[in-house]
Amino acid sequence: MTKEEILYNVQLCDVVYKDQKDIDFKSLGLTSVKWIDDKKSDTQAFVALKGKSLYVVFRGTSSKKDAQNDVSIDKVPFIKEGDKVHIGFKSSWDAVKNIILKDITKMSGYDKIVVCGHSLGAAVATLCAYNLSHVFTDTTIECCTIGSPRVGNKTFKNNYDNQKIKTLRIVHNNDVVTHSPVIGYYHVNHMLRIDREGNIKKFMIDWERAWNYLKSMVTGKNIKDHMTAGYISSLKKWYDKQP
């Protein structure tokens, strides 16, 4: 992904939290917009075209129902043998899967599918991208997420990474949500960690990461680090530093 694409994708992760009527899709360059709102699961997303790209963007936690999906830690089977994923995240994806697949199939003129989301939306986007990579096997699949929790077991993580999905999982400083669920869950590749000044943070050893996390917990900054506004602000600083 180019730096322009990364910043655009992250802005879409924020825009999807608005009511449909309040989103200026035209100014975003999006056409053929299909808005999805599953009332039962409280899962929202949109499918749209922008040039040769088809976008699928998921909203994150925005209600009590979403929060209930977040806190469950049980795992259930997914696509390949050995895949186990978070039951709440899979429930959200299952609620909208058929309509999204139908909308994508109806659209034409694109050569890649870009899936985006924040928080719970990031987890659902990860499952969506993985699912789409098994259905649209001749189409490039990209996945750009911010503030994503861990989604599944190690087998799922390995199978996902082997699908050659062009993934960028962005972590803002000490975002608390990216540390959960803890036991038996793993992150998919590839991670870009940035601090509040827009600097890329290299891999930290466990004790260093834990220390920074604890410091942020004391100050409450790890909650702020999870907000889309923080991601956008820091990524804009990162963007301005790029050649």
Task: Identify the residue ranges that each predicted region occupies.
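Non-catalytic, mobile gating and regulatory segments of ester bond hydrolases
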Residues: 1-116, 120-243
